[in-house]
């Protein structure tokens, strides 16, 4: 587990505060971007391991390494063994080798899924300070680095531990799609030498005469985001239909139980009036097995992904609307 220390003189004591900030070395950001550029294609997801340490309530990510791309046919590949060998090699060259989380690329903001939930729960259950970094290459390609850190909320961690994803379980935990993930602020830190080099390169960069401030973003981004949003809404609608079918089956079964109980009572009254022995009471639940309640976690995840798409569309449209108003004002001859 990542070491969590609090500097008090020359002693280190265990701190119980949660991770409130993520500090990432610039080299780690470049390695994540490079990993996607080399192995990511379209909607294909790339993943990797984050290494670092925890100081007070700050998680410092100092290194990372990628998961190699492999298919189901690669039966000889052992992912756990690969991670252990990589961390052992890093330890031999005196590089931070403490496991503090993982990273994953996303396609138009698509990352809220059961696979990510299960993976992050496994990481966070084993290593309390773990985070997952979500890198969006589409937004980054438009000139704005998109890298966010997420953790599962304590509420969702408890639900995953109990493994009760029924409607009653989620209601008891008082959890909604807004309560699944918590975003942790990110700070990108470079060494002084890298900052000096970046300053020198910026001075040497040629000055372009083109002003791209008012250029509108590609409409393909909005079109694709809306298409993905509609697909998730359709999935949520189908999931709601399945749950409503389950509720109807429950109601129908309750009516059948009630009718069976009434018939048995009437039959026993008739037998008693004829002086015959009453029929024994039977366990109604054995005769009418209740239908298996569907998991509501998938609906929760779909709702969370819908919310993510909406936030991306809102951000995209607000930026373009601002550019449109600025362009209109600049064309006004009275100004």
Swiss-Prot record:
The keyword Phosphoprotein does not apply. Residues 254-263 have a biased composition (Low complexity). It is found in: Cytoplasm. Residues 254-287 are annotated as: Disordered. Keywords: Cytoplasm, Initiation factor, Protein biosynthesis. One of its GO terms (biological process) is formation of cytoplasmic translation initiation complex. Transmembrane segments: none annotated. GO terms for molecular function: metallopeptidase activity; translation initiation factor activity. Its main location: cytoplasm. Residues 22-156 form the MPN domain. Residues 267-276 have a biased composition (Polar residues). GO terms for cellular component: eukaryotic 43S preinitiation complex; eukaryotic 48S preinitiation complex; eukaryotic translation initiation factor 3 complex. It holds the Pfam family eIF3h_C. Component of the eukaryotic translation initiation factor 3 (eIF-3) complex, which is composed of 13 subunits: eif3a, eif3b, eif3c, eif3d, eif3e, eif3f, eif3g, eif3h, eif3i, eif3j, eif3k, eif3l and eif3m. Component of the eukaryotic translation initiation factor 3 (eIF-3) complex, which is involved in protein synthesis of a specialized repertoire of mRNAs and, together with other initiation factors, stimulates binding of mRNA and methionyl-tRNAi to the 40S ribosome. The eIF-3 complex specifically targets and initiates translation of a subset of mRNAs involved in cell proliferation. Belongs to the eIF-3 subunit H family. This is Eukaryotic translation initiation factor 3 subunit H.
